[in-house]
Amino acid sequence: IGAHMDGHGWGEAANDDGSGTALVMELARVFSMPDVTTERTIRFALWNNEETGLNGAWAYVNQRKALQGIENPKGSGKYPEPKWLGVIQHDMMMWDHGMPRADGSFSAEQRPEADVNIEFQSTAKLADQAMKLAFFFRDANEKYATDYPAAVGHHMTNTDSTPFMDDVAAV
């Protein structure tokens, strides 16, 4: 579960991506509570240099991909880099994706009333798995956050899940 910490300094950084960073930190706080258990390890990551080329996420993928699922030290039962099952990137959480274009029209991929936009990349090697993950979250959102309707889009670009999208389901 990730977000990027950097932003442009002319006013948008609180949303792009201070909002995503705050959400990831809150999720980490909640999931680290003693009474919360999960069946899988959840890694929380805050990337840097997204605005200048996804450099932090690319560095992580390049440095850690080959280490997935390798026990270290051998026989310890410890896996410093768990096998990746998916990536959930939070970017611009306060953006109103339902706003119409300047001419008043809406994107075909977004509902006019959508407050949550869940995107995957349809050209990724694992696009089918990413699409399933996106619709899983959309369906969960429809069930648990009925005041915040969600839409799924298939043109995810230029965010920190991009370096992962050919290796795991990424939204």
Q: Model segments located where?
A:
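Short, well-ordered alpha-helices that flank and scaffold nucleotide-derived cofactor binding pockets
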Residues: 25, 29, 33, 62, ...
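A residue-level signal for beta-strand positions that form part of recognition/binding surfaces
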Residues: 41, 84, 170
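Short, surface-exposed beta-strand/loop micro-motifs that present aromatic residues
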Residues: 161-163, 171
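Alpha-helical metal-binding/catalytic segments enriched in His/Glu/Asp
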Residues: 1-54
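Amphipathic alpha-helical segments that form well-ordered structural scaffolds
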Residues: 23-26, 30, 132-140, 163
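General alpha-helical segment detector with a strong preference for membrane-spanning helices
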Residues: 8-10, 95, 164
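Metal-dependent peptidase/peptidase-like ectodomains
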Residues: 47-158, 167
